[in-house]
Amino acid sequence: ASPVLDANGDPLVPGGQYYVLPHIWPGPGGLSFEKTGNQTCPVSVFQLPRLPLEQNNGKPLVFTPVSETDDINEDTAVEIAFAEPPSCAESGKWLIVNDFKEEYWSVGIGGPQDHEGYQTLTGYFKIHKVGSFAYMFSFLPFVR
């Protein structure tokens, strides 16, 4: 598998901090966490809006390979977490959340107790190359 590359063309380093930005410029901003609904802690992952004259980078993420290797490769399982999560959350680790009403799922952070009243799925993510200069994430739920 090929290594996942940063904007400079260098392989991602496990434990390093990276901003996830859209590949279109100008475009929306990077990723951050916010409060939604009746949350008292900002545990919902959002893409920030574009700022008029500057890039809105959002908050840095850390990628951790799940396999025995120390490499972060395309199409292999990784954990994704915000480097500096809010202190009220269990962690900055990503998970999938559903409110039982909508047909779509969203990305949150922390643990199930951070999303009381919601269905949560924990698991890993894969990073897939899309075109020449972009990547997308997919989710791999833990099977019980």
Curated annotation (Swiss-Prot):
Annotated InterPro entries: Kunitz_inhibitor_STI-like_sf (IPR011065), Prot_inh_Kunz-lg (IPR002160)
Disulphides: 41-88
Site positions for Reactive bond for elastase: 66-67
UniProt superkingdom: Eukaryota
The keyword Thylakoid is assigned to this record: no
Key words of the record: Disulfide bond, Glycoprotein, Protease inhibitor, Serine protease inhibitor
GO MF annotation list: serine-type endopeptidase inhibitor activity
Sugar-bearing residue positions: 38
Keyword Glycoprotein: yes
Described function: Inhibitor of porcine pancreatic elastase with a Ki of 27 nM. Does not inhibit human neutrophil elastase, bovine trypsin, human plasma kallikrein or porcine pancreatic kallikrein.
Additional free-text comment from the UniProt record: On the 2D-gel the determined pI of this protein is: 4.56, its MW is: 16992.79 kDa.
Family: Belongs to the leguminous Kunitz-type inhibitor family.
Protein name per its UniProtKB record: Kunitz-type elastase inhibitor BrEI
Species for this entry: Bauhinia rufa (Orchid tree)
